[in-house]
């Protein structure tokens, strides 16, 4: 019985540091820090209407944004992060662009492509949920996944395969 109690205490003590490192929301300062830790240049500001954090960031030559959603408290801490990047088509959107968007979305598990026809832009986004608590490693891996989504998106839309 003493061994069982000792084992339960040890498990509880080992779990405590992991729970302390769990994050269920990020402030603007924390968002900037995790993006910087991932090797990305980022500038965090606030949304003019909601005062929620918004980051403008660079992944190589690609500019993207991270909009923080589902925020509470002061400073605002947000449990949902939406990463997105938009690209100029250089022309009006065509039916083949919609086919390419659909093909990307059919094949890609992470990330979602979309068209902004009134702006002649095409884009991709990726949502990261923190609600319920996630580790710093989980956040880091999701940021790396986002850069992979950008690469897959650019590769897909740079291919010569019309409608695929």
Stretches with model-predicted labels:
Residues 3-4, 16-63:
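Charge-rich, low-complexity N-terminal segments
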Residues 9-17:
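Hydrophobic core
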Residues 22, 36-38, 79-121:
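Short, internal acidic amphipathic alpha-helical interface segments
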Residues 28-35, 95-101, 140-143, 147:
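Extracytoplasmic/secreted envelope proteins and their assembly/folding machinery
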Residues 46-48, 68-70, 85-87, 126-130:
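A mature extracytoplasmic/lumenal domain signature
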Residues 57-87:
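Long, continuous compositionally biased terminal/linker segments
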Residues 108-150, 154:
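A short, solvent-exposed beta-edge/loop patch
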Residues 158-164:
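Short, highly charged C-terminal tails/helix-capping segments
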């Amino acid at each position: 019985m003493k061994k069982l109690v000792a084992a339960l205490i040890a498990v509880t003590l080992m779990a405590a540091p992991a729970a302390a490192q769990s994050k269920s929301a990020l402030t603007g300062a924390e968002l900037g820090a995790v993006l910087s830790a991932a090797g990305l240049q980022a500038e965090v500001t606030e949304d003019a209407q909601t005062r929620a954090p918004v980051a403008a960031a660079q992944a190589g030559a690609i500019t993207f944004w991270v909009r923080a959603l589902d925020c509470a408290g002061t400073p605002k801490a947000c449990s949902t992060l939406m990463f997105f990047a938009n690209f100029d088509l250089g022309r009006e959107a065509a039916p083949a662009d919609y086919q390419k968007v659909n093909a990307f979305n059919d094949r890609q598990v992470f990330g979602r492509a979309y068209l902004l026809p009134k702006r002649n832009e095409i884009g991709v986004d990726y949502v990261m949920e923190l609600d319920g608590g996630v580790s710093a490693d989980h956040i880091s891996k999701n940021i790396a996944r986002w850069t992979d989504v950008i690469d897959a998106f650019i590769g897909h839309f740079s291919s010569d395969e019309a409608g695929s």
